[in-house]
Amino acid sequence: MSTLEEVLSEAYKLVIPSEEEEKRIREVTQKVKRLVSQIIEEGGIDALVDVYGSGARGTWLPGQRDIDIFVVLNDRRIKPEDVVKILTSRFTTLGLNWALRYAQHPYVSLQVDDYEVDIVPCYKIQPGERPITAADRSPLHHKFLSERLKKDQILDVRLLKLFLKTIGVYGAEIKTEGFSGYLTELLVVYYGSFIEVLRAASRWRPYKTYITFVETSAKFKSPLVVVDPVDPNRNAAAAVSLTSMSTLILAARRFLKKPSLSYFQPSRGYAIRQVETVEVVYPYPGEPPDIVWGKYKRIGRNLFKWLRECGFKVFRWGVESDEKTYVKLVYVVEQTKLAPYTLHKGPPVYDDAVDAFIEKYVNEEVIGPFVVGARAYVIKKRKWTDISHCINAKLGKGNYDIRVNLYDGDLVRKTPWLT
């Protein structure tokens, strides 16, 4: 068995980028920054073009191919949409490969070699000032972390990001509902190191963990609360779901008990093929990813409840997508075909509700009503015995396919990192 020190020694090596990679990301960043600055200046826009986020603080992971450049507007009469229009017009003239993305407002994603550079307009705000868009906080976040994140903590941030990525909870988008890069860095600043974050996380309790850098009177109702130091009315951990928080708690406990490099090496576990599954597969809609994930998680949750009402036992379910061609709902079930009859439990015989139960079923084609113990029961015919028919009844006609027992994704695989 490897010791904690031995595992950490090897793990730190995984998050140190090569000199060539560091040089390349600097070159691409500066190249795009100069271009954007030139376009903004020529457009007569009063703004500062700068790099924030992990790229600016050196907390990015090896292999990361995304860079964030911000256009910080001093003039609030200028709309982010105007900035995007000026940038995309010039990018088109130059023959560059760009795409329009959406958060609270549009921004531009520019493809440079094998890097994706997001160019995000935002407004300049002062500490404590109410932001107009979520991106407005980014310069303040950068200032706070740059002043507090020590040089020897940069590797700890990278290691924590890799740990979170491996266990599937890195990213604040709706797809993941996990820990943002900013939140990850805040945790290292607060607790001091990667291992101290894990020691603390192993003792966290949902809805009882409150981390703050500043005094605030704001009340938050989230599994995890980390008060944003640049905006005390905001919970920097608001995106973290109960499942994501609990996954980190479990991973931290197990890693501290049995350290292993598996927590830093994302991989797929082997599939358990004996279980039954059903997939509802849709073509990917032309909408922003957060919209798509939110929409299909809602559809998936409603269908999950419906399947249970129909008598299908669902072990687990999820939404999966390549964000290009498909989005699908996946259900791991006990069985995809049910027996034609089911036992239906009624009220106790001494309860007034038993009369309505008897009157409902006494003339129906059921077995019973009969009594077992103190309750009335019937054995009645199911409306749907095939899971596909049950799904069609709920979703109606639509542009989707139903696939039964063809799935071999993560929902039917062994958890590869857990020791």
Curated annotation (Swiss-Prot):
Q: Which reaction does it catalyse?
A: a tRNA precursor + 2 CTP + ATP = a tRNA with a 3' CCA end + 3 diphosphate; a tRNA with a 3' CCA end + 2 CTP + ATP = a tRNA with a 3' CCACCA end + 3 diphosphate
Sites where the protein binds CTP: S54, R57, H141, K161, Y170
Extent of the signal sequence: none
Q: Which domain of life is it from?
A: Archaea
* EC number(s) per entry: 2.7.7.72
Binding, Mg(2+): D66, D68, D118
One Gene Ontology BP term is: RNA repair
Question: What's the stated role of this polypeptide?
Answer: Catalyzes the addition and repair of the essential 3'-terminal CCA sequence in tRNAs without using a nucleic acid template. Adds these three nucleotides in the order of C, C, and A to the tRNA nucleotide-73, using CTP and ATP as substrates and producing inorganic pyrophosphate. tRNA 3'-terminal CCA addition is required both for tRNA processing and repair. Also involved in tRNA surveillance by mediating tandem CCA addition to generate a CCACCA at the 3' terminus of unstable tRNAs. While stable tRNAs receive only 3'-terminal CCA, unstable tRNAs are marked with CCACCA and rapidly degraded.
Q: Which family does it belong to?
A: Belongs to the tRNA nucleotidyltransferase/poly(A) polymerase family. Archaeal CCA-adding enzyme subfamily.
* Quaternary structure note: Homodimer.
- Miscellaneous field: A single active site specifically recognizes both ATP and CTP and is responsible for their addition.
Q: What is this protein called?
A: CCA-adding enzyme
Q: Which organism is it from?
A: Pyrobaculum aerophilum (strain ATCC 51768 / DSM 7523 / JCM 9630 / CIP 104966 / NBRC 100827 / IM2)
Q: What is the lineage of its organism?
A: Archaea, Thermoproteota, Thermoprotei, Thermoproteales, Thermoproteaceae
